[in-house]
Amino acid sequence: MGARVAVAGASGYSGGELLRLIAAHPELELAVATAASHAGQPIGAVHPHLVDLADQVFAPTDPAVLGDADVVFLALPHGQSAAIAATLPESALVVDIGADFRLRDPAAWAKFYGGTHAGTWTYGLPELPGARAEIAKSRRIANPGCYVTAATLALAPLFAAHLVDPDDVVIVAASGTSGAGRSLKPNLLASEVMGSLAAYKVGGVHQHTPEIEQNLSQAAGEPVTVSFTPILAPLPRGILATCTARPKAGVDGDAIRAALANAYHDEPFVHLLPPDVWPQTAATLGSNSVHLQAAFDEAARRVVVVAALDNLTKGAAGQAIQNANIALGFPETTGLTRSGVAP
């Protein structure tokens, strides 16, 4: 029998993706799935694609229901995880997909999320230097944001190698509508989204901005300032992030590619594509993979790194499973796939 798992907030898109991955995981057993608005309903009524779990019934999101599990995944709206987490036994492995424990700076939390900062947990981006060792000994893990994962994996090796300047970083990233959650919003109606792209939270106000800056500043060893513009794209899932920065003197395209290759040559889920092959979201769907490609714009003196990932998998549920695998001592790739389902 595998580790007993609870998923809080399992009726949402990230929660549903967690259920899909848990059902196929040889070392995890779903003990309970909770959903405040769907308590008492069968999982199959909300997630008809989850045939193996269709008859299991959603429980209320109650700490007493979650406390018996060995592993608890929190897939709750931002600001709701802290209260639940405080009631769970210290022996349980808790992975929070929300933002409650990602930021180290309470002022940044107050500015971008509001309310009281709940604290900081071990940051669960395994591909960062030293992260696996910290994750392996932790029982509380904060899963990174989806945009943050794409931007950090694209640029962190360049900052670590001191190849780019810290004060001229521009990230423009398009995401599918599932990144906005499952609750009804007028701007997510099919008639509003189909055939249209829309920028939103422009001008440094998106809540992932301080998290991106936190990660890149850590890699650089000095403060990094980022201009981040998110775009809502007419597709259900996937992120394509175009990340640019100003190179330091003497840096060329070969140095950029070498830094990325050196950082990720042994990584199971980060793939630097062959030269001139550019990332596309469709190639990553359903997988825990990130696809990267880089270019050097000599005329504009800009480094360009493009990243593609599935926002629900490597950007959320898949990364949570990856973190749990590390913390539980399982092979890191257990229950996860590197290959997408395109076309």
Swiss-Prot record:
GO terms for biological process?
L-arginine biosynthetic process
For molecular function, the Gene Ontology terms on record are:
N-acetyl-gamma-glutamyl-phosphate reductase activity; NAD binding; NADP+ binding
Question: Which superkingdom heads the taxonomic lineage of this protein's source?
Answer: Bacteria
The reactions it catalyses are: N-acetyl-L-glutamate 5-semialdehyde + phosphate + NADP(+) = N-acetyl-L-glutamyl 5-phosphate + NADPH + H(+)
Its GO CC terms are: cytoplasm
Write out the catalytic residues in the record: C146
Q: Which PROSITE patterns match?
A: ARGC
Free-text function comment from the UniProt entry = Catalyzes the NADPH-dependent reduction of N-acetyl-5-glutamyl phosphate to yield N-acetyl-L-glutamate 5-semialdehyde.
The family line of this record is:
Belongs to the NAGSA dehydrogenase family. Type 1 subfamily.
What protein name applies here?
N-acetyl-gamma-glutamyl-phosphate reductase
Q: Which organism is it from?
A: Acidothermus cellulolyticus (strain ATCC 43068 / DSM 8971 / 11B)
Q: Which gene encodes it?
A: argC
